Amino acid sequence: MELALQITLIVTSVLVVLLVLLHRAKGGGLSTLFGGGVQSSLSGSTVVEKNLDRLTLFVTGIWLVSIIGVALLIKYR
């Protein structure tokens, strides 16, 4: 059980980082320091962006549950 939670935690951590990096910068913030402040000609969210948002939230939820699971296993070991 502990090994499965740790593997899930590692996989979801990597996925969250990759999914966040795939998001398009929406202006402002630190992305403008690195040239990310350029506006595109297409405004609004596409279906791909909405699905990417949903997938990011889903993977983040799994990540959060695995963090809590590992913490509980450590506490009640």
Curated annotation (Swiss-Prot):
<keyword id="KW-1003">Cell membrane</keyword>
<dbReference type="Pfam" id="PF03840">
    <property type="entry name" value="SecG"/>
</dbReference>
<comment type="similarity">
    <text>Belongs to the SecG family.</text>
</comment>
<comment type="function">
    <text>Involved in protein export. Participates in an early event of protein translocation.</text>
</comment>
<feature type="transmembrane region" description="Helical">
    <location>
        <begin position="3"/>
        <end position="23"/>
    </location>
</feature>
<keyword id="KW-0813">Transport</keyword>
<keyword id="KW-0653">Protein transport</keyword>
<keyword id="KW-0812">Transmembrane</keyword>
<keyword id="KW-0811">Translocation</keyword>
<protein>
    <recommendedName>
        <fullName>Probable protein-export membrane protein SecG</fullName>
    </recommendedName>
</protein>
<dbReference type="GO" id="GO:0009306">
    <property type="term" value="P:protein secretion"/>
</dbReference>
<dbReference type="InterPro" id="IPR004692">
    <property type="entry name" value="SecG"/>
</dbReference>
<keyword id="KW-0472">Membrane</keyword>
<dbReference type="GO" id="GO:0015450">
    <property type="term" value="F:protein-transporting ATPase activity"/>
</dbReference>
<feature type="transmembrane region" description="Helical">
    <location>
        <begin position="55"/>
        <end position="75"/>
    </location>
</feature>
<keyword id="KW-1133">Transmembrane helix</keyword>
<dbReference type="GO" id="GO:0005886">
    <property type="term" value="C:plasma membrane"/>
</dbReference>
